[in-house]
Amino acid sequence: MSSGALFPSLVPGSRGSSSKYLVEFRAGKMSLKGSTVTPDKRKGLVYIQQTDDSLIHFCWKDRTSGSVDDDLIIFPDDCEFKRVSQCTTGRVYVLKFKAGSKRLFFWMQEPKTDKDEEHCRKVNEYLNNPPMPGALGGSGSGSHELSALGGEGGLQSLLGNMSHNQLMQLIGPTGLGGLGGLGALTGPGLASLLGSGGPTTSSSSSSSRSQSAAVTPSSTTSSTRTTSAPVAPAAAPATTPSPAVSSNDGASAATSPTQAIQLSDLQNILATMNVPATGEGGQQVDLASVLTPEIMAPILANAEVQERLMPYLPSGESLPQTADEIQNTLTSPQFQQALSMFSAALASGQLGPLMSQFGLPADAVDAANKGDIEAFAKAMQSTSSQKERESSEKKEEEEDMSLD
């Protein structure tokens, strides 16, 4: 399963986006029932757009009513768009997700077939190789612009409401411009911005504040959003595909009312900064090379460990929360890449202030400040052991009281 995966947009169109779609073509939806798919006769439009937060959206809307039935956020390598060769009665395409059995079927409504292959190629290109977001102009202004996000209060609100997916996006190569942002904050720096006694104010900011920050509801979900507005079906063109088609070929966080902060603001500011120097923690450790499938296998075989990890699995109709999914998630290329990204960011010695925002113990924050991954891991393990002891002691006390 992909750790970056896909999830529906909370409110389609609520975030700023380019006025022009990356690719669009007329196509109808198809519903999957058992092993066959049947066409939805409404006139539709498939389009891909990149919103101001740099995320790629795969959308389908009814051309008659204008309502958007599907608005899915797609990450690279999540899915593949291809033609269903088994269907000979129409031009049927499937958006097949590489993790799970989720599939979305569409039938072409373009009058000519000459651009079908081009549309298919462009869909795959933009989904798996999205354009790089435009960086903010002006060097050396990162600290000032970060201050404009609202200082400690605003950043804490933003970071506290981030999902796992968004945090990985923030510290990833796109969000951080090659892990350059955190280490390049000098002067007041990230430490003073996150650890100051009060919020920093600014009269202006390079990023728009007209929109409220929207946080996706889960890290990975394959469900689509269905609008409640009634839709008037339109007559199907003569090329409507046959009902029987084999399906075997594929499948807002609230911020301060006076200072709405967007994840894209922080991302764009960090993306303009320079790559940090190596932290003080000595030789850099890549967690991806440590937490290998071979090492994790006996740990994941423990039923107690599985039970503790299960609630953190992505949820969705085609994403069962099972022990197998835990294994699939931790061994996926996306998860391994996220580990490497986090290792590099932690080794930079600049994640201490960020870690303190998540309520981590002082030892862990100190290790993060030094870029000492080994000390950070030991601090986290010590904290976990202490919590387990406290929980066990509390349970024993409750049992003793019940006996009395």
Curated annotation (Swiss-Prot):
Has keyword Nucleus?
Answer: yes
Q: Which GO terms describe its molecular function?
A: endopeptidase activator activity; proteasome binding
Keywords linked to the UniProt accession: Cytoplasm, Nucleus, Proteasome
**Which stretches make up the DEUBAD domain?**
278-390
Q: Which stretches make up the Pru domain? A: 17-130
Name by which UniProt lists this protein = Proteasomal ubiquitin receptor ADRM1-B
Whether Transferase counts among this entry's keywords is no
Quote the subunit structure annotation: Component of the 19S proteasome regulatory particle complex. The 26S proteasome consists of a 20S core particle (CP) and two 19S regulatory subunits (RP).
Cross-referenced Pfam families: Rpn13_ADRM1_Pru, RPN13_C
Localization annotation? Cytoplasm; Nucleus
Return the Basic and acidic residues bias intervals. 386-395
Record field: compositional bias (Low complexity) = 195-247
The primary site where this protein sits is cytoplasm
InterPro entries noted in UniProt: DEUBAD_dom, Rpn13/ADRM1, Rpn13/ADRM1_Pru, Rpn13/ADRM1_Pru_sf, RPN13_DEUBAD, RPN13_DEUBAD_sf
Q: Which CDD domains match?
A: PH_Rpn13
- Which PROSITE patterns does the record associate with it? DEUBAD (PS51916), PRU (PS51917)
> Which PANTHER family does this UniProt record tie to the protein?
ADHESION REGULATING MOLECULE 1 110 KDA CELL MEMBRANE GLYCOPROTEIN, PROTEASOMAL UBIQUITIN RECEPTOR ADRM1
Return the Polar residues bias intervals: 248-258
Q: What does the entry give for GO biological process?
A: proteasome assembly
Which family, according to UniProt? Belongs to the ADRM1 family.
